[in-house]
Structures are given as C-alpha cells and as structure tokens.
Amino acid sequence: MGRFISVSFGLLVVFLSLSGTGADCPSDWSSFKQYCYQIIKQLKTWEDAERFCMDQVKGAHLVSIESYREAVFVAQQLSENVKTTKYDVWIGLSVVNKGQQCSSEWSDGSSVSYENLVKPLSKKCFVLKKGTEFRKWFNVACEQKHLFMCKFLRPR
C-alpha cells in the first residue's frame, strides 16, 4: 500500500510540474507565456520559411517578438540550440509596401510594439544575428537562406 501511494504521489508531482510549462506544446516545441516556439535548422528563404511554419501547425508563423522579455527568451533558445556561427535566424518581421509608404509588419499580423533594429531599412526581411547573441535585428535580402524559428499561440 505504501509503495502504491508513493508511486501515485510521484506521478502527481510530475503531472503538476508539467502543466503550465511546455506541456501544452508539441513535444519538440518550447513554451513561453501563451506561445510555443520551434527552431528549424534548415536553410530557407524568408518566404519559404514562413510557408514551412504555416504548414507545421495551424496558426504558426515565423517568430514575432513583442517584448524585451520575449526577445531574451528567443535569444536564449537560439544561443543554446544553434551552435554554428555561419547562419543567422529569420524572424517574422518584414517591410511591406503600401502605396507610397512602407511599414514593418509581423507575418502573424501582430503589431510591432517592440523593436531592436540595427541597420536602416534598405532590404525587406529581418534576421537575428548570431554575432549579437541573437539579440539584434538586421535588415537583409529576403532571398538569402537562413535558419528560422516558428511560433504559434498555444491551445487552451
């Protein structure tokens, strides 16, 4: 009887420790607040990377970064998992032409409420640079091929 209670209690502790973390995300995704994130170690153009994310999970897009805390989380995940110094990582920010004006927009439709841009807007797509520990956003040509990170709203 004592062994049964011990095992049951152990399973309860494991279950409770998983709930609210990455337990609601697919097994190969990380969790931060209400979102799930996945690093994709394939080289793709910005457009192909966005399409890949959208094909993975309903509602997934290239990662949008909406706060300093989220930027720190994303940089930490990338620093721990991307060991090559050769490639940068696509984010979902791009410059969109609207008639005579250009504006920056996230591919998931969220508003640009946090920015960490380094270069002026001469190209259309953005990467996180490995050389800045994935903390600075650089404007590059969308046709380049980079690794990328996908993000989606965790199901409730």
Swiss-Prot record:
GO MF annotations, alphabetized: toxin activity
Quaternary context: Heteromultimer; disulfide-linked.
SMART domains in the cross-refs: CLECT
UniProt cross-references to InterPro entries, sorted A to Z: C-type_lectin-like, C-type_lectin-like/link_sf, C-type_lectin/snaclec_domain, C-type_lectin_CS, CTDL_fold
UniProt xrefs under Pfam families: Lectin_C (PF00059)
Taxonomic source organism: Trimeresurus stejnegeri (Chinese green tree viper)
Entry's family note: Belongs to the snaclec family.
Lineage: Eukaryota, Metazoa, Chordata, Craniata, Vertebrata
Main location: secreted
Protein name in UniProt: Snaclec stejaggregin-B subunit alpha
GO cellular component entries: extracellular region
Protein location: Secreted
Leader sequence segment: 1-23
Cysteine pairs bridged by disulfides in the record: C25-C36, C53-C150, C125-C142
Primary role: Interferes with one step of hemostasis (modulation of platelet aggregation, or coagulation cascade, for example).
UniProt entry keywords in alphabetical sequence: Disulfide bond, Hemostasis impairing toxin, Secreted, Signal, Toxin
Keyword hit for Cell cycle: no
